[in-house]
C-alpha cells in the first residue's frame, strides 16, 4: 500500500472524540440503538465517563429551576424542568432531596409533587448552565398555617451539582 492510499484511508474516518461528541447530543433512545454498531461504539457509550457527560449535557440543555426550601436545619432541594409551551402554570418535580445537615453533605431522597408558579413569582435569568439566585416575592413561603420556610430559586441548574 502506498503512502498516498494510507493518507486517504485515514482521512475517511471520523475521529473518536468527534464521534463521542455527536453521540452525546443525540436522544438516549438513539444512543441505545447505536450500541450495536460496533464493539468500540458499545464500549464508548456504556463507559461511566460517557454516561456522566451524557446525563450532565442533557440536563444542561433543558431549562430547569432548582428550588431550595429551608426548615430549621433541614434543607429541601427540588428540581423542576421548565416547559415553555406549558399553559397550566405548574412545574412537575423531576428530582428532590433532603439535606439534614448541608455542612456534612448527607443527601437523601425526598418527594414533593407539584409547585405552582402562582404560589410565588420567580424571575429566571436567561443565562444557561449557571446557578444564580433569582428574585422571588418575599424570602419566605407559607406552605401551611404553622410553618414558614425560607425559599431560594435557581434557574438552569445542572442536576449533578446537587448530588455532589
From Swiss-Prot:
Residues 9-56 form the F-box domain. InterPro entries: F-box-like_dom_sf, F-box_dom. Pfam families: F-box. CDD domains: F-box_AtFBW1-like. It comes from the Eukaryota. This is Putative F-box protein At1g59675. It comes from Arabidopsis thaliana (Mouse-ear cress). The lineage of its organism: Eukaryota, Viridiplantae, Streptophyta, Embryophyta, Tracheophyta.
Amino acid at each position: 500500500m502506498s503512502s498516498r492510499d494510507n493518507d486517504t484511508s485515514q482521512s475517511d474516518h471520523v475521529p473518536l472524540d468527534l464521534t463521542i461528541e455527536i453521540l452525546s447530543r443525540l436522544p438516549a433512545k438513539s444512543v441505545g440503538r447505536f450500541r450495536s454498531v460496533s464493539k468500540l461504539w458499545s464500549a464508548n457509550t456504556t463507559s461511566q465517563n460517557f454516561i456522566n457527560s451524557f446525563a450532565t449535557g442533557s440536563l444542561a440543555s433543558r431549562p430547569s429551576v432548582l428550588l431550595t426550601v429551608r426548615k430549621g436545619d433541614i434543607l429541601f432541594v427540588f428540581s423542576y424542568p421548565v416547559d415553555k409551551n406549558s399553559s397550566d402554570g405548574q412545574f412537575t418535580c423531576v428530582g428532590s432531596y433532603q439535606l439534614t445537615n448541608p455542612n456534612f453533605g448527607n443527601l437523601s431522597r425526598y418527594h414533593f409533587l407539584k409547585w405552582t408558579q402562582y404560589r410565588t413569582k420567580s424571575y429566571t435569568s436567561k443565562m444557561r448552565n449557571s446557578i444564580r439566585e433569582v428574585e422571588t416575592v418575599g424570602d419566605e413561603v407559607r406552605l401551611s398555617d404553622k410553618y414558614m420556610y425560607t425559599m431560594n430559586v435557581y434557574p438552569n441548574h445542572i442536576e449533578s451539582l446537587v448530588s455532589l
